[in-house]
Amino acid sequence: SMPKFNKENILVEVYNLILDSETTDTERKELVIFKDEVEKGLDFDNALMKLADHLRLIGLDNVLKHRSMSKKVNKFYMKINSVGQFKKNFGIYFPPMF
């Protein structure tokens, strides 16, 4: 079933990534936007989905520029990544058919 993420745990993780010196400015910008939106009371799942999508775009851009995502942000992205793709496409999670 859909991974359900704990809001407080995710926020703590995001705060730590924002403060981490290895986090790039581009990554940090997206993390700060997410943090601000959640603190303003925006829907957590939607904000997380948007963050996953934006980190995915950063990842694709990095590939084109032969850069890599900072290690901890990449690990965090891998964890939340599943939420964006499935929820957006179907509203519910369907396991891949292959």
Model-predicted regions and their roles:
Residues 1-32, 95:
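Short terminal alpha-helical segments
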Residues 8, 12, 28-32, 45-49, ...:
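Non-catalytic, well-ordered alpha-helical scaffold segments
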Residues 19-22, 39, 43, 85:
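Residues in soluble alpha-helical coiled-coils and helical-bundle/repeat scaffolds
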Residues 31-40:
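Amphipathic alpha-helical segments that form the core helices of the histone-fold
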Residues 40-44, 95-98:
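Intrinsic-disorder/low-complexity, polar/charged segments
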Residues 42-76:
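Short, charged early-sequence alpha-helical segments and their helix-coil boundaries
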Residues 64-98:
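Amphipathic alpha-helical binding modules
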